[in-house]
UniProtKB/Swiss-Prot annotation:
Excises uracil residues from the DNA which can arise as a result of misincorporation of dUMP residues by DNA polymerase or due to deamination of cytosine. Belongs to the uracil-DNA glycosylase (UDG) superfamily. UNG family. SMART domains: UDG, UreE_C. It is an enzyme of class 3 (hydrolase). It catalyses: Hydrolyzes single-stranded DNA or mismatched double-stranded DNA and polynucleotides, releasing free uracil. The active site is at residue 68. This is Uracil-DNA glycosylase. It comes from Mycolicibacterium vanbaalenii (strain DSM 7251 / JCM 13017 / BCRC 16820 / KCTC 9966 / NRRL B-24157 / PYR-1) (Mycobacterium vanbaalenii).
Amino acid sequence: MTARPLSELIDDGWASALAPVESQVTQMGEFLRAELADGHRYLPAGENVLRAFTFPLEKVRVLIVGQDPYPTPGHAVGLSFSVAPDVRPLPRSLDNIFREYREDLGYPTPSTGDLTPWCEQGVMLLNRVLTVRPGTPASHRGKGWEPVTECAIRALVARQQPMVAVLWGRDASTLKPMLGDTAVIESPHPSPLSASRGFFGSKPFSRANELLTQMGAEPVDWRLP
């Protein structure tokens, strides 16, 4: 992760919104460089750490919150739950998301695990913690990313524009008090450990569109190639 101003790395709207925590982002860059110096790699690749903030702040209408990046090398791309188009097999959480996508919307299974088309529709795929050590889930929790992502969520809420927050799992649900009057869809996490406890059948995609329509906003076209 390069030591450059946020305005050179992310969307202008996000650069302004995250200005109060820019020094924290700088500190996290220093932390990641120290990890490398100690012989520890991190995921995703440096140029993708802030990728969720490269899509326009003003266009976000659905927020999907993840926990931290996939710890498997080659999987994490800087967008929660998404992977690069060539990744096979898919992470099991994403497999479960696609199962619910099929059952909720009636669409065929997407050809890849790349969720970028959702981001281009105004769906923000944000992890609470933006980096992880390979093979060690949750290894960067409590290291300093949480104030950054919480600032981002407060900025989304402060716009007072139609938005639906989709919170999968207990970690994501702790953000609910920060969301104010934002419409929220909550369920267990799509992980194989919890998906059968209420994620399957929760219909997050169609419910998000129903809520957006009730607010007078355009629904999301969830179809993936």
